[in-house]
């Protein structure tokens, strides 16, 4: 609902942009200390790697439309196989950010993917000396961006009158859902 002054100008109310906007879709981070910054070897320190996924955009992402792979190291060094680190899916559907009835922004879903798959643990094997490993999450997902603009279509697009309801020429504002 919007209110108008006597002049007909809007004085607040509903947002004029149909989208929240932004430049992010799914944000991807490791949970704190996951993987841990340091472990002891010889199977004496088991651990998981937890990837946090948050939908910062305006499109819903189904569980089956997102795959997470853990890469950057040989899983055999931690008692696992490459299959234990491939094509993991999040626990939940990633619902988008939305605008509430009062105009407030409702945050999108945050969900998690745990490695290795199947609820098991990484168990560091025996290493010679200190060894650094790179853990990286590669995430592939289907996403969409929508846009909207108002066009001006008149009965006579050649002989445009000064008092026409709209102007078909010139630049138009394009609204985008971002990402």
Write out the residue ranges for each language-model feature.
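Non-catalytic macromolecular-recognition regions in eukaryotic signaling proteins
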Residues: 4-179
């Amino acid at each position: 609902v919007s209110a108008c002054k006597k002049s007909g100008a809007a004085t607040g109310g509903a947002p004029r942009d149909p989208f929240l906007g932004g430049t992010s879709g799914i944000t991807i981070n490791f949970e704190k200390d996951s993987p841990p910054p340091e472990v002891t070897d010889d199977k004496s320190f088991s651990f998981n790697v937890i990837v946090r996924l948050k939908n910062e955009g305006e499109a819903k992402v189904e569980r089956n439309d997102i795959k997470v792979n853990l890469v950057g190291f040989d899983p055999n060094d931690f008692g696992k196989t490459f299959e234990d680190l491939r094509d993991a899916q999040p626990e939940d559907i990633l619902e988008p950010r939305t605008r509430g009835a009062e105009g407030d922004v409702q945050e999108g879903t945050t969900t998690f993917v745990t490695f290795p798959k199947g609820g098991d643990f990484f168990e560091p094997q025996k290493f010679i000396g200190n060894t650094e490993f790179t853990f990286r999450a590669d995430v592939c997902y289907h996403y969409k961006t929508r846009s909207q603009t108002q066009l001006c279509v008149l009965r006579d697009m050649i002989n445009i009158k000064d008092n026409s309801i709209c102007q078909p020429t010139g630049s138009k504002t394009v609204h985008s859902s971002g990402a």
